[in-house]
Amino acid sequence: MATFKLEVVTPLKKVLDRDAEMVIMRTIEGDMGVMADHAPFVAELAVGEMKIKSANGEEAYFVSGGFLEISKEKTMILADEAIDVKEIDVERAKREAEIAKETLVKLKEDKDIAVTQKSLQEALTKVRIAEQYMHHL
């Protein structure tokens, strides 16, 4: 299968820089798959799972939003956060979800509610993705 250069970058580090056969991620308009020779494209990423398929098999990452840019040279994912599913601390993510739920009950400001809802969504997504992959190992 044909490959393309994939880069995944967060504000803190370069997470990946290698060849891939396909990457599937969630954009704000729905799930999207990218393969070699995809047309140039830009999209906003949503909180969700990113699956990468290569000759070495399949990997999964948690992505907390950001942007996708597809060009002739490469596919770049500029993520707020990107964590290999194997590195997710499920118990910590569950605690983060509980804290966010408790905080939501107390909030009055719309902007605070939106930020806390995103934190809750991120924590619950981490738990879902990590638990899903633990059962497949």
Curated annotation (Swiss-Prot):
Family annotation (Pfam families): ATP-synt_DE, ATP-synt_DE_N
GO molecular function: ATP binding; proton-transporting ATP synthase activity, rotational mechanism
Keywords in alphabetical order: ATP synthesis, Cell inner membrane, Cell membrane, CF(1), Ion transport, Membrane, Sodium, Sodium transport, Transport
Gene Ontology BP terms: sodium ion transport
UniProt keyword Protein transport, yes or no: no
Compartments, record wording: Cell inner membrane
Keyword Cell membrane: yes
Family matches, as InterPro entries: ATP_synth_F1_dsu/esu, ATP_synth_F1_dsu/esu_N, ATP_synth_F1_esu_C, ATPsynth_dsu/esu_N
Lipid bilayer topology: Peripheral membrane protein
Source domain of life: Bacteria
Coiled coil: none
Gene Ontology cellular component list: plasma membrane; proton-transporting ATP synthase complex
Additional record remark: The ATPase of P.modestum is of special interest because it uses sodium ions instead of protons as the physiological coupling ion.
Self-association state and partner proteins as the record states: F-type ATPases have 2 components, CF(1) - the catalytic core - and CF(0) - the membrane proton channel. CF(1) has five subunits: alpha(3), beta(3), gamma(1), delta(1), epsilon(1). CF(0) has three main subunits: a, b and c.
Function: Produces ATP from ADP in the presence of a sodium gradient across the membrane.
NCBIfam families the record matches: ATP_synt_epsi
Family designation: Belongs to the ATPase epsilon chain family.
Protein's name according to its UniProt entry: ATP synthase epsilon chain, sodium ion specific
Biological source species: Propionigenium modestum
Annotated gene: atpC
